[in-house]
């Protein structure tokens, strides 16, 4: 009987440790730019707003930007993830590098020419190419 309790406790601890040490399943916000990034790079588990018909995906970039940008592919390299984002029309893509800088902060750097934009008045303007992201509380 005690052995069964031990293994149940061990499974619970390992499960918690896996989620606590998982830097690639999270929700981030840049409070200054009001941009959010929600990702799960371990499985396609996130419903992307306005793209529900495609089923769960690995994540999206949204908030104070024009449209929603879905994570269409990614590569994890040590402490960085290279994300490929596609807009909700499928007409533009943006590569971005996500780097963990501390337990609760990340930097999202848009690579190449920035195509992610925000509407200001009647015009579209490119967002800043480097976003300081803070991990949202689960």
Language model segments and positions:
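Central antiparallel beta-sheet cores of small beta-barrel/beta-sandwich binding domains
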Residues: 21-101, 109-138
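Bacterial Sec-dependent N-terminal signal peptides
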Residues: 1-24
């Amino acid at each position: 009987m005690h052995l069964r309790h031990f293994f149940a406790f061990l499974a619970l601890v390992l499960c918690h440790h896996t989620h606590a040490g998982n830097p690639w399943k999270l929700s981030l916000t840049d409070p200054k730019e009001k941009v959010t990034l929600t990702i799960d790079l371990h499985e396609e588990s996130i419903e992307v707003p306005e793209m529900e018909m495609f089923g769960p995906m690995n994540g999206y970039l949204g908030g104070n930007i024009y449209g929603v940008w879905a994570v269409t592919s990614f590569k994890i390299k040590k402490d960085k993830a290279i994300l490929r984002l596609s807009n909700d029309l499928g007409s533009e893509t943006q590569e971005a590098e996500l780097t963990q800088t501390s337990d609760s902060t990340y930097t999202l750097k848009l690579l190449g020419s920035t195509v992610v934009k925000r509407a200001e008045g009647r015009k579209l303007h490119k967002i800043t190419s480097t976003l300081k992201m803070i991990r949202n509380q689960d």
